[in-house]
């Protein structure tokens, strides 16, 4: 998985475990795609300080994932649901309407 995409996905799961400042900087960098210089200017700090904060947060998010595996479990669940739905559609000729209904119900589990 590409690092930037992986960190963005980890933010979805673990951002509430970061401080408000960390969440803000990470959102500006990963979601809003601002440069380190732009974020530093907004936070009235140095580019190096922002770089260090982002790297620390990246490590922290990866550490949370290595312990809790929420992203991995979610991706495994998503894959299982998609495989199950495809099998259901192929074996039992499920209509597109029913397929979407089943998909929605399974995703809400």
Swiss-Prot record:
It holds the Pfam family UPF0122. Signal peptide: none annotated. HAMAP family: UPF0122. Might take part in the signal recognition particle (SRP) pathway. This is inferred from the conservation of its genetic proximity to ftsY/ffh. May be a regulatory protein. Belongs to the UPF0122 family. This is UPF0122 protein CLL_A1244. It comes from Clostridium botulinum (strain Eklund 17B / Type B).
